Structure formats: structure tokens, C-alpha cells
């Protein structure tokens, strides 16, 4: 199992002007960390986790039922997945829907006024990622 990425490294990766890259890559880091939690906490082989039949919904069900993930962290993961799906499956995603999803994201801590169109998204990805990494280290 590789060492988790630092928050600073993820922040640098998310510093892109390409919306599709931002939303797909941001979610990839979240889901990859979820995969590693499942491997470590439940001894699920990576071969099984990598199967297309092992969907994010199934992964989230396992983590939710076990009590590992709940509340705003769960909500953020679900919203990040919805945003990712819009960009992965539509040539021109509905910008208003994306804005609404981002508005629903939780900072998972205090936050000062954000600047930039997707600043809140970036902060929420990094903080959700950070919470998941802490879960992985327990």
C-alpha cells in the first residue's frame, strides 16, 4: 500500500483551470482512499475492489454500515461522486446543477471567504480526503 498523498500535494494537483480534470481527478483521489480503507479495515483484496461490479455505492454501503463513514463526510463523498459523474458522462454538464452540488458540500471545519469559482470544491475535496486518510491511519 503506497503512502497517502499530502494535503499540499493534492492542492497542487487540483490547481487546474480544466473543469473536467478538476472534478474527475478530485473524485479519483477520494475513491482511491476509500479503496485503501476497505483493503486495510476489511482485508478486501484490491483485485476485488478494482472490479467494475464493486461500485462506489457498494463501497459506501460497507463503510456506512460499519460506522466508519457518516454525516458530512458521507455527504461530501456522495456529492463529489455526483459531480464527477456529470463530467464523466456528459459532454456539457448542467452548470447550475454542478453549482448546486458544490453549494451543498460541507467544509468539515471552519473556512474563510473563498475566492475563485471552484475554491469551495477544492477545499472540500482536500478536507474530505484528509478525513479519509486519518481514517486509513487508525
Predicted segments — roles?
Residues 1-138:
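Amphipathic alpha-helical interface elements
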Amino acid at each position: 500500500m503506497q503512502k497517502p498523498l499530502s494535503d499540499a500535494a493534492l492542492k497542487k494537483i487540483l490547481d487546474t483551470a480544466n473543469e473536467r480534470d478538476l472534478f474527475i481527478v478530485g473524485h479519483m483521489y477520494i475513491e482511491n482512499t476509500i479503496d485503501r480503507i476497505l483493503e486495510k479495515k476489511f482485508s478486501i483484496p484490491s483485485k476485488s475492489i478494482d472490479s467494475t461490479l464493486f461500485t462506489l455505492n457498494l463501497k459506501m454501503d460497507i463503510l456506512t454500515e460499519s460506522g466508519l463513514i457518516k454525516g458530512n463526510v458521507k455527504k461530501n463523498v456522495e456529492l463529489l461522486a455526483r459531480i464527477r459523474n456529470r463530467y464523466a458522462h456528459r459532454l456539457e454538464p448542467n452548470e447550475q446543477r454542478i453549482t448546486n452540488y458544490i453549494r451543498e458540500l460541507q467544509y468539515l471545519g471552519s473556512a474563510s471567504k473563498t475566492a475563485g469559482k471552484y475554491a469551495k470544491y477544492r477545499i472540500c475535496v482536500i478536507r474530505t480526503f484528509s478525513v479519509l486518510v486519518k481514517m486509513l491511519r487508525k
